[in-house]
Curated annotation (Swiss-Prot):
Keywords: Cell membrane, Copper, Electron transport, Heme, Iron, Membrane, Metal-binding, Respiratory chain, Signal, Translocase, Transmembrane, Transmembrane helix, Transport. One of its GO terms (biological process) is ATP synthesis coupled electron transport. GO terms for cellular component: plasma membrane. The gene is ctaC. Its cofactor is Cu cation; heme c. The chain crosses the membrane at residues 45-65, 93-113. Subunits I and II form the functional core of the enzyme complex. Electrons originating in cytochrome c are transferred via heme a and Cu(A) to the binuclear center formed by heme a3 and Cu(B). InterPro entries: CcO_II, CcO_II-like_C, Copper_CuA, Cupredoxin, Cyt_c-like_dom, Cyt_c-like_dom_sf, Cyt_c_oxidase_su2, Cyt_c_oxidase_su2_TM_dom. It is found in: Cell membrane. Its main location: membrane. It catalyses: 4 Fe(II)-[cytochrome c] + O2 + 8 H(+)(in) = 4 Fe(III)-[cytochrome c] + 2 H2O + 4 H(+)(out). This is Cytochrome c oxidase subunit 2.
Length: 356
């Protein structure tokens, strides 16, 4: 008896801890803080379905408790046979019609929302408005590539989009199945190797300001040992700032290095790293040859490898042993041993990669 009670207490304790930890996430890394039109629609459907489920549970629980108390066996009536009821057409109609009504209440807005979210005609129109933003998202183990086909720009890890308007996405994977998800803004949708998925999102400017100008995205499909580390950042900008960013990226030149140590790092980079990485956003290589993240704006990024704080020490840690940071990544083992001097030089060079 005491052992069972002890186990029950432990179970209750772990249950309370799980509930407490569920509320400890970062701001705007939750579907419960919608930050755009799609997120608002999905949140409304969650509230609707949850409300219906709670209503059903409460009503059934009340009826259950009432029946247990009202028709319980009383003292002295142990041998009394209760009145036998063959059935009730009225009750049968009620408990058939009510679920149908509840299903319709849930189904109608769900179907309408599904068709609205699936409307991507604007992105497939060859004569689409020049201001319509389309992003080709390519998922790789364990990093993200973002291509803006109408602007000729390619970036990695940091997604830049305009606020308060629809942004359309083409989703595909280069190796295994992944899933593109920005919890606060909407999603999620799978990226497959053999077909493209399409959808759209809207990034709210007020919510962006509250979030500090950055949203967090993740891979939401188990894809390997570093699945949990396959993050990316989203930087929504007002339309005028987004246009300025596009112009800056389109006019980007090959970086000119003046620092002697950084020059040494550039030489090391050009011997091997350049075969996979690019240092300009105007990368003309086909997708099959873009086997590693574009590093054009590496010096201005939020994170190293999508997860480490952006500083020189973490970059050196990544260069020494990428597998210790992201197990199973494809960069590990592609280059020989680097001396500390070479790592220092590479770090200096990579930190200087900025689009001015």
């Amino acid at each position: 008896m005491n052992k069972g009670l002890c186990n029950w207490r432990l179970f209750s304790l772990f249950g309370m801890m799980a509930l407490l930890l569920a509320g400890c996430g970062k701001p705007f890394l939750s579907t419960l803080q919608p930050a755009g039109e799609v997120a608002d629609m999905q949140y409304s459907l969650m509230l609707l379905s949850t409300s219906i489920m709670v209503l059903v549970i409460v009503v059934v629980a009340i009826i259950f408790v009432y029946v247990v108390i009202r028709f319980r066996r009383r003292k002295g009536e142990e041998n009394k046979i209760p009145k036998q009821v063959e059935g009730s057409h009225k009750l049968e109609i009620i408990w058939t019609v009510i679920p149908i009504i509840l299903l319709l209440i849930l189904a109608v807005p769900t179907v309408l929302t599904t068709f609205k979210l699936a409307d991507v005609k604007a992105m497939n129109d060859k004569k689409r408005d020049k201001n319509t933003v389309v992003v080709n998202v390519r998922a790789n183990q364990y990093w993200w590539e973002f291509e803006y086909p109408d602007y000729g720009i390619i970036t990695s890890q940091d997604l830049v989009v305009p606020t308060n308007e629809k942004v359309y996405f083409n989703l595909i994977a280069s190796d295994v199945k992944h899933s593109f998800w920005i919890p606060a803004v909407g999603g999620k949708m799978d990226t497959n190797t053999d077909n493209k998925n399409q959808f759209w999102l809207v990034f709210d400017q007020k919510a962006t300001d509250k979030a500090g100008g950055v949203f967090y995205g993740k891979c939401a499909e188990l894809c390997g040992p570093s699945h949990a580390l396959m993050d990316f950042k989203v930087r929504p900008l007002p339309r005028d700032q987004f246009d300025a960013w596009v112009k800056k990226m389109q006019n980007a030149k090959k970086p000119v290095v003046t620092d002697p140590v950084a020059k040494e790092g550039e030489a090391i980079f050009n011997k091997s790293c350049i075969g996979c990485h690019a240092v300009t956003p105007l990368d003309k290589r086909p997708a099959q040859r873009r086997t590693a993240p574009n590093l054009a704006d590496f010096g201005d990024r939020e994170r190293i490898a999508g997860i480490l704080e952006h500083n020189e020490e973490n970059l050196k840690k990544w260069l020494r042993d990428p597998n210790s940071v992201k197990p199973g990544n494809k960069m590990a083992g592609t280059y020989g041993h680097l001396t500390e001097e070479q790592i220092d030089a590479l770090t200096k060079y990579l930190m200087s990669l900025k689009v001015e």
